[in-house]
Amino acid sequence: MANRKLFIKSYGCQMNVYDAGRMADVMAPLGYDLVSEADGADLVILNTCHIREKAAEKVFSDLGRLRPFKEAMAAEGRRMLVAVAGCVAQAEGAELMARAKIVDMVVGPQAYHRLPEMVAKVERGAGRVLDTDFPIEPKFDFLPAPQAHGPSAFLSVQEGCDKFCTFCVVPYTRGAEYSRPVADVLREAALLAEGGVREITLLGQNVNAYHGEAPDGRTWGLGRLARALAEIPGVARLRYTTSHPRDVDDDLIAAHREVAALTPFIHLPVQSGSDRILAAMNRGHDVEGYRRIIDRLRAARDDMAFSSDFIVGFPGESERDFQATLALIDEVRFIQAYSFKYSPRPGTPAAALSAQLPEAEKSARLIALQARLVEIQQAFNQACVGRPMDVLLDRPGRHAGQLVGRSPWMQPVHLEAPAALLGTLAPVVVETATSNSLAARLVEGNSSMSSDRVLAEEAPPPARIRA
């Protein structure tokens, strides 16, 4: 009997990408193979995001597109099962079931290890399934060993959030902060490395709030965990996301100084450059505190660069508040960023605020902010020209003889290289740059080049920040 087909579409964050991979791992023993198209799939999973209204509404649009596929399969005597997973499922599960009859299963982000049971229940005619309970025992205890798919992999070490920013649904959809035990993380990382993974990105809603229990009963923070992961044979690079400024501690900063595998690039969301707006968001820090963290991290590694999240048009944001955000962007010189118009999320405190801004004003501010960010990104990329760096080659390029990889700062790098180098860290020198990527040539030498610690001097320098 031929294996069944599984199609998964993920929306939103890297955690959803990780979760999608683990769903595939859960279903693989039942004979489900991943496919790239929903048409003809036996099981379709929409792994959803609830951060913004647009992302949530897109789920219903995609469900409408699935209907003809499901009906066509039914006409052939076959059955397509449709599951909605992720944060929309958690927040709006009952509404999904009522509004979209095409949906067979609604699966919360802490329940997808039970997918095989849900599928079996639907297949035996026991009705549709809604499972959005937060389990007493962590889902990780029930997941199979991870499968390596290429030289880079995500590894979830922390989930949930206790911060309760006024704009955010994550505490309600992902639950309280939970850190996986140290031994489990190290075991999973070792399995990935044995499968050829060279770069591991540690994931968490607040990943640097990690406080996992070690075998001796002590609690490890993210810095100590990074040191242990770097000792695993084969692990050449470590990244982590998403971090919160409140959880950047002394040991994590020291780890960036001491652990060569930790890349000099941190996603550290600030959301706004205005103290007034940060307080309204309940972020738990002010702009000066954020500056001090940036300054300390740059003191640990002088090639450190940053990305961030920005929300424009938060309720009550004045033009002065917005200009303060632009000033912080100019000061820190973020080389990447995710930026959005404020989107009220039902049930969050900010949604009830009266000073909501007009959409036109939010749009104009977003355009201005993104233009400023693009200028900085272009300058950073251009300043990399002529510089040596190590690139993790992770996929073939568009042209014959071309490979594509990632720089330490996450820029895509294109170069001519033999296919045998796929999956390795290769020493290169950057020859040209665009706003989005770099082109480089392969050079002779050891792939563990220290040149990853070079920050392009020709770029407009990041402002030194007051201690």
Swiss-Prot record:
> Per its Swiss-Prot or TrEMBL entry, what cofactor is needed?
[4Fe-4S] cluster
Q: Which reaction does it catalyse?
A: N(6)-dimethylallyladenosine(37) in tRNA + (sulfur carrier)-SH + AH2 + 2 S-adenosyl-L-methionine = 2-methylsulfanyl-N(6)-dimethylallyladenosine(37) in tRNA + (sulfur carrier)-H + 5'-deoxyadenosine + L-methionine + A + S-adenosyl-L-homocysteine + 2 H(+)
Q: Where would you find this protein in the cell?
A: Cytoplasm
Q: How is the cofactor bound?
A: Binds 2 [4Fe-4S] clusters. One cluster is coordinated with 3 cysteines and an exchangeable S-adenosyl-L-methionine.
Q: Name one GO cellular component term.
A: cytosol
Q: Which UniProt keywords apply?
A: 4Fe-4S, Cytoplasm, Iron, Iron-sulfur, Metal-binding, S-adenosyl-L-methionine, Transferase, tRNA processing
Question: Which segments constitute the TRAM domain?
Answer: 382-444
Q: In what residue span(s) does the Radical SAM core domain sit?
A: 147-379
The main place the protein resides is cytoplasm
Gene3D superfamilies from the xrefs?
Answer: Methylthiotransferase, N-terminal domain (3.40.50.12160), tm_1862 like domain (3.80.30.20)
- An MF annotation (GO) of this entry: 4 iron, 4 sulfur cluster binding
| Residues the record lists as binding [4Fe-4S] cluster 2 | 161, 165, 168
Q: What does this protein do?
A: Catalyzes the methylthiolation of N6-(dimethylallyl)adenosine (i(6)A), leading to the formation of 2-methylthio-N6-(dimethylallyl)adenosine (ms(2)i(6)A) at position 37 in tRNAs that read codons beginning with uridine.
Q: Which family does it belong to?
A: Belongs to the methylthiotransferase family. MiaB subfamily.
Q: How does it assemble?
A: Monomer.
Check the record and name the NCBIfam families matching this protein: miaB-methiolase, MiaB/RimO family radical SAM methylthiotransferase
Could you identify this protein by its name? tRNA-2-methylthio-N(6)-dimethylallyladenosine synthase
What is the species listed in this Swiss-Prot or TrEMBL entry?
A: Rhodospirillum rubrum (strain ATCC 11170 / ATH 1.1.1 / DSM 467 / LMG 4362 / NCIMB 8255 / S1)
Q: Give me the gene this protein comes from.
A: miaB
